[in-house]
A protein has these predicted regions:
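Short, solvent-exposed polar/charged micro-motifs at secondary-structure junctions
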Residues: 47, 124-126
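Extended serine/threonine-enriched, polar tracts that run as long, contiguous segments within proteins
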Residues: 118-122
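A surface-exposed partner-binding patch
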Residues: 1-107, 113, 117
Length: 178
């Protein structure tokens, strides 16, 4: 995959890509590892704009809120819309207990890393080719079968590949798109 070729086609402003040290600093600061394809993309060029996370110089509080968005959205649906994930066993009767179980359940799930707005990719498994999701509370859908497909989809580029017969399952998150 030539990330430079794809970057050159995107109608997005870019800064120079992240250095190895900047990648390591972001990963340590926020306690996750970029999947290899996202890391390669971000090291080719760093997208710029209000809907892109700024892993180089972005506000820590804003980035932490963005990273916590999927958990907060799911907790909202647990409290307001009676959502309950089957991995969490029986739902406690008291809402405070249900929220505690749900919060721990989401924390145990693979970390979702923002790419653009509420489009996110799982940090696990740590290999290229994880699907990209659109995540809004428990309204979660695929938005690309991998990072390159997602970017072509999001920015209306031609030559999108056909969807594969099977998209890599991601622990916990694949439940929402079944």
């Amino acid at each position: 995959m030539s990330w430079r070729n794809l970057v050159d086609q995107l109608p997005v402003e870019f800064d120079p890509g992240l250095t190895d040290a900047e990648v390591e600093r972001a990963q340590q600061r926020f306690e996750f590892q970029f999947p290899p394809d996202l890391r390669d993309f971000l090291q080719t060029a760093l997208p710029r704009g209000p809907l892109f996370p700024d892993w180089r110089a972005g506000d820590d509080a804003r980035l932490r809120d963005w990273l916590d968005g999927p958990r907060q959205g799911i907790l909202f649906d647990v409290e307001e819309n009676d959502f309950w994930h089957p991995d969490w066993n029986a739902r406690p009767c008291m809402i405070e207990d249900a929220l505690s179980v749900a919060s721990e359940g989401v924390k145990a799930a693979p970390r979702m890393i923002p790419i653009f707005g509420h489009r996110m990719i799982s940090a696990e498994p740590h290999q290229p080719g994880n699907p990209v999701y659109s995540v809004h509370q428990t309204d979660i859908i695929y938005y690309g079968f991998d990072l390159a497909d997602y970017l072509r989809h999001e920015f209306n580029l031609p030559d999108r590949a056909a969807w594969p017969a099977k998209i890599r399952p991601i622990r916990f998150w694949s439940y929402f798109v079944q």
